[in-house]
């Protein structure tokens, strides 16, 4: 019986790559497809970028020097709306 060709779409992270040796024996070794590695890498970077944006936002918010309550509320709401829009775009 012929083996199906392994692709990231037919196999999960428990991907098995079957190779033929010179003497005709088959060996199986677990392997992560490159596409899954790349996706994990991208997700890690995106979460770091999002976290960095939040930290910068709160540092700016904390650095305001004795603003009035009204101006503080307006400024925070503007920043929050801008931040939320960027999250939707990305």
Swiss-Prot record:
Cellular localization per UniProt: Host mitochondrion inner membrane; Host nucleus; Host cytoplasm, Host cytosol
InterPro entries according to UniProt: Flu_proapoptotic_PB1-F2
Swiss-Prot/TrEMBL keywords: Apoptosis, Host cytoplasm, Host membrane, Host mitochondrion, Host mitochondrion inner membrane, Host nucleus, Host-virus interaction, Inhibition of host innate immune response by virus, Inhibition of host MAVS by virus, Inhibition of host RLR pathway by virus, Membrane, Modulation of host cell apoptosis by virus, Viral immunoevasion
Span list, region Mitochondrial targeting sequence: 65-87
Biological process, per Gene Ontology: symbiont-mediated perturbation of host apoptosis; symbiont-mediated suppression of host cytoplasmic pattern recognition receptor signaling pathway via inhibition of MAVS activity
GO annotations of cellular component type: host cell cytosol; host cell mitochondrial inner membrane; host cell nucleus; membrane
Matches recorded under Pfam families: PB1-F2
Site feature High pathogenicity, where: 66
Origin superkingdom: Viruses
Biased composition (Polar residues): 1-27
Region entry Disordered, spans: 1-34
Predominant localisation class: host cell
Miscellaneous section: Is not encoded in all strains, and seems to be dispensable for replication.
Subunit structure: Oligomer. Interacts with human SLC25A6/ANT3 and VDAC1. Interacts with host MAVS.
Function of the molecule: Plays an important role in promoting lung pathology in both primary viral infection and secondary bacterial infection. Promotes alteration of mitochondrial morphology, dissipation of mitochondrial membrane potential, and cell death. Alternatively, inhibits the production of interferon in the infected cell at the level of host mitochondrial antiviral signaling MAVS. Its level of expression differs greatly depending on which cell type is infected, in a manner that is independent of the levels of expression of other viral proteins. Monocytic cells are more affected than epithelial cells.
Protein family according to the UniProt entry: Belongs to the influenza viruses PB1-F2 family.
The protein's name in its UniProt record: Protein PB1-F2
Organism of this sequence: Influenza A virus (strain A/Chicken/Hong Kong/715.5/2001 H5N1 genotype E)
Originating gene: PB1
């Amino acid at each position: 019986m012929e083996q199906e060709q392994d692709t990231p779409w037919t196999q999960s992270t428990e991907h098995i790559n079957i190779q033929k040796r010179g003497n005709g024996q088959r060996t199986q070794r677990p392997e992560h497809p490159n596409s899954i590695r790349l996706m994990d890498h991208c997700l890690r970077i995106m979460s770091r970028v999002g976290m960095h944006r939040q930290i910068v936002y709160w540092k700016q918010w904390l650095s305001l020097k004795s603003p009035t309550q009204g101006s503080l509320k307006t400024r925070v709401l503007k920043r929050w709306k801008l931040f939320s829009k960027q999250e939707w775009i990305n």
